[in-house]
């Protein structure tokens, strides 16, 4: 495929989508994406549908195809979804990402107490925080390294260091590590410095400082890289390599690799000091680069990995390890196997600048060979960045817009995985980029390194767009490191290093470590000890879990299936389960399991069961009850368990087998209840004589009693609780109700402070507790303040009586009046009361009567008259009556302007076949207009309609066409209105297919994709996988009417993909899948063949498949074969082979070659061949041995079952006499156990007895051994105590025995003594020499010996790790440790205090662990403070122990409490010490125990309980003890309002009042009423009332529209829905309609009287509904309904109907027509031009009248010359194509009226 670009380009495509971003408020947020397209797309950013523009905080950086959105100082309002929209000429694409802005953590509140100064920064109570972290370093070998960290936190954290996940003392060679604590840092916090003296290459690695205290753990890491100093100048590559290592002593191993594959070498080296590793190739040191990776694996092995091997990589690779004790080598010879098919010209390494381009070029042997490009293991697809070009045999890869991450290894691959490799180097600010990806196990350390061109520059590390903290970043010169210690799954993501516009990215992947759950406890046992308890014991799991764990104990009642958790235990051992732990009495079983963070172990069930009984205790006892006479008395108590009890009243047992009972007939009634742990006794309606009754409760273990006290209840008002405001209209019934707490208690009513007197208009009633004042028909004078007074308390009512509101009867709608200058305008408003006050307003100002404005009144009708209206009189008029208004809009048009609308030019855009209407409004309804199009008068037709309606003139195009575009004029006299119509084609739509189509085809099938459009001539474009297709022989594009087709005549699998048919405004999608043809076996033709071969021999099975690329699988006897040296599989073109190079009889069987669709079977049989000697054992000829030495002669036959015979010098050899004959498979062996001189000669092994049978001979020579002697002498040695001593000598012959003696005693090998034999060299090694090992060492061989003297010098016992000052708190355990340079003998060191030996006891103990000596002080006391020392014979170290008194701390702090009014609150805290006395305070005032305040303490726990709380109790609760003070907040909230009783369903009659009522739990609360989910608002018909806790909703004059669902809501409480049903009133007609006859132009009035005044009616004329307005006026006067029809017309004749509900009345209206007259006549004289059109027009008095047109007295007939038109009252005569002969007199006859016009014609013919 050649690179090319189409003319149309490619639509935008997102290569990388923006990622969601989470930032803290005030930080910087950045979104990035990569978009490609041709031409380069325009990128816009949007939020909430609005395009974003650059500002001070918002910018849009671009870098080639990378586009970004940078938001500085992010605010919470900036959060949301941001859309990146890319658009070019070829299409559009978009992507979205969310930005989340988090609020910054709130600052810690400052302590209220000023007694203690605030702690220094970083040392506040809490988890450790790193103030200063270690910094990564790059040093030369031998340099000193100092890693320092400083940590804050309280309590002071414990610090320790790790290297590569191991503690420093676990590192093999850590003698040069020194830890220096510094607890006196000036800026606070703990500090621990790691100092490495004379750094070595093995010291390279990741160092992590851990900080841990009771509140948590923190860690920070740094990278240390130790480099070899550059001692020699760089070598000229043309010079031969200089040997830097010793020659190898043995032949290296050989390793073969195919070209383009990876080679991996691994060596494992041990030594002390830890050895330094170097890799060499052909003697030259290797350095890591892009294709050579050097690292150390998790098992400690050193690995060299050569990527994508090439021919130049062949050679000898050596791993050299050296330390101060010596060096060792390991080598391997690498051979690179080159493929047969090779690149004609391979790739060459290239370099390029960042943001530039590079070109990689190679040549293939044949232009038809397909190739693929890779960047390392990632396949590269063609795009704008990676342009792939094929020109003949040349293959090019052009990389555009280079970035740091483009640096790497690139490959071009042919078939057969033949590759050519090249390096691409990107020059820029970043020299060494990050790896593509990094895989790290969970918990390991992750290290990322970047090298920059300039030193000292500041880069930025981020993960998934979020900047990483500075504690894990380090920079030194050109190197930048990111160290992530102990990675977790949350650390995974895309890590980026940015430097200006350059960046490099890696994908950090964290692999989870699978942890096993802990094991179960063992040795579980149950002991039934004391009564009502059970003892459970167990042992910890084996092996114990690695992490912390607990034990979970569960119980199960026998007979139940449910297990219930009892409690959790941290330590193993025993636990006693009392009966109080179970809810009810029963037999219980128990089980236990181990739980840790890694899961739960299986349960272990304790054998047997235990019977447990819960013991009842009194949790909350009985209390004396005081109630009023007639109320219920409730006694209750709470027990600790569910148990039955008995109630007593005055010593008499109350029956509890019934829900209710009675002490005795006619006496006190009671009710007993039990809910769970609570028992209640309710004495109902107690009387005064029950005063002093004693109530008791008894159950097993509990007995309690209380007394009943009854008081005479004072009278009080139950309702209303507050003042009631009531509003009524005159004649309404008013009822004021006051409910008292006592029955028949007297009360007095007052009005305005005066006692009321009963009369017919005011009635006072008393009914039980309720007292009522009734006004049967309220009047305005009854308004006032009413009071119901009794026993000094009162209920108040404010009553307001008003006249009923006035309503406007007509008009009900907005009235629009149009008039011309000097016309009379009348505005009429009718109200329902004649005495109502009416006010008129114009444009908001009240009008006053004058010469130009006349105000009239006629009964309920009020009029405003403009006798001679002027344009300035127009405006907005209002008729205001009470709260109602009627609106009139008056428009006065000057005669000079006939066209009211439109005022300017109108532009109409339409789509073909749409309906277009042009509207022109005139000032008068009888005015005539003329319509023209592009200067020509239009003619009415089905395609063009002219309409006239009152003052409106319309031109209608029912189905507009393209040719209808143009300018239309509506002309009248000298005025015109202009309309410009533009008609366009409708957008193209795809009719078929509507959904995505999926097609499946087989190779070479014809695939047709069809798309049907809404337009025949619409163009389309076809795309495949986002690229526009081009028509070729393999892809044909067709067009047939509205159908468009894409045809693949012979589809191939690569033709599959997503096809898109793009019609501009619409697209259709097709998914095509083309599968390969069936895979067949074309040779052999037979499907089963029988083949025979010799064994052993070469067997080859061969098949040919079609197509040639088909995959096959081979089977033997039903099992798939595996490739090995004995079985090889081959494939070349269509041929597939299976080869057995050395077939044996056992290889016979059934072989099957199987493709996806076919198979062929080979039945292979193997016959044995004659016996042959395959190979003798590798022995010299002749074989020379010494007497007594064993001899073994061996050979191998071609068949294991063959028989052989042995002979010695021609004589048969027999078993025995020191000779042994053996057969081991195909091998035949002759063994001589101890050779002597008689065994010299020729030994022959012959197969078979036939003459000429194959044979094999061996020549054995037995000779005397050479004498044994020592060749070299031992050397005297002097070593230090603890070092190794090595004695070495050489012996001849090499196999001679050597005996070692020490001080004359034979040496026996052991842990300290080691003897080494290597050729002729003999070595004795004495490990860890001690002073007692000094003496003489002797080596003896044969008759010779040699001796040397060993001297052992005593080593000084010095302290490597010295004592450190320790600060401790009284009662803690303190440990002092030192580390010596060697392991000293017991008692080699001694401990001191104050310079004196330290006496040891149970609190002071010492211990030694190798090099470490430890002093332990358990439960340190204040007297233990002082100076402690540790000394040996050669060294001494001192440290100071400081002990501070035990401080009081809170282990569990106080917590804020929120309760409701009347509730109780409990505050509890736990201190670090017992027996502490503290004080509780509220709002700074000390609290003392009382009825509402309970204070108690138990051990370290202190508790405060406050009950009966009110709103005023909110505030600060504090606890003070010694120097400790802690506080919490108490918040008391109001009890939320609830709805006690909601509204009920109602059914009312239309016109009546509906009242909904609900009752609340509180008096002062606002209620919202809703109807059908919508809140209701006040209106004249809707009133709201509040009566104490009752809330009323009153709906007056209900109609059917009021029906629906009503509910009330208060706060969060909502009542259930209540349904209002409005019944229709039964209406009957009292006064029927009367038929009328009237003349045209007169008025007609119809009246109908019905039985109900609140009924609405409906009027009809001729079956058509009538509505007020124009000539129709409708009004209602009580029960009378009136219809007035003015300006009658003949067409008004018909039946008049009035209907009110089911009632109906009919009448007949007859309208007599007036004689037809002309209202407007034609001009007496009219002049027209020749060839033009003449129009004569008249207007008659009524529409439908007939007129007659005549010329010179002769009636004209319609035709092509004359056209008669009629529209309403207008009649026209149109004379077409006027000629001179058309001159004359034209007459129009309308009834008895006529008019003449003289037509004059001007112009030449």
Curated annotation (Swiss-Prot):
Pro residues: bias regions: 104-122
Disulphide bonds in the chain: 33-84, 149-209, 267-319, 362-412, 738-788, 829-879, 920-970, 1011-1061, 1103-1153, 1195-1245, 1558-1608
UniProt cross-references to Pfam families, sorted A to Z: I-set, Ig_3
Domain Ig-like: 12-100, 128-225, 240-330, 339-425, 720-800, 804-891, 902-982, 986-1075, 1078-1165, 1176-1261, 1266-1351, 1355-1442, 1536-1628, 1702-1798
UniProtKB keywords: Cytoplasm, Disulfide bond, Golgi apparatus, Immunoglobulin domain, Phosphoprotein, Repeat
Domain of life assignment: Eukaryota
Ranges for domain Fibronectin type-III: 517-615
GO biological-process terms attached to the record: Golgi organization; microtubule cytoskeleton organization; positive regulation of dendrite morphogenesis; protein localization to Golgi apparatus; regulation of mitotic nuclear division
Region Disordered, residue ranges: 104-131
One GO term describing the cellular component: 3M complex
Major subcellular location class: cytoplasm
Gene3D superfamilies according to UniProt: Immunoglobulins
Annotated localization: Cytoplasm; Cytoplasm, Perinuclear region; Golgi apparatus
Identification of the protein by name: Obscurin-like protein 1
Organism expressing this protein natively: Rattus norvegicus (Rat)
Gene behind this protein: Obsl1
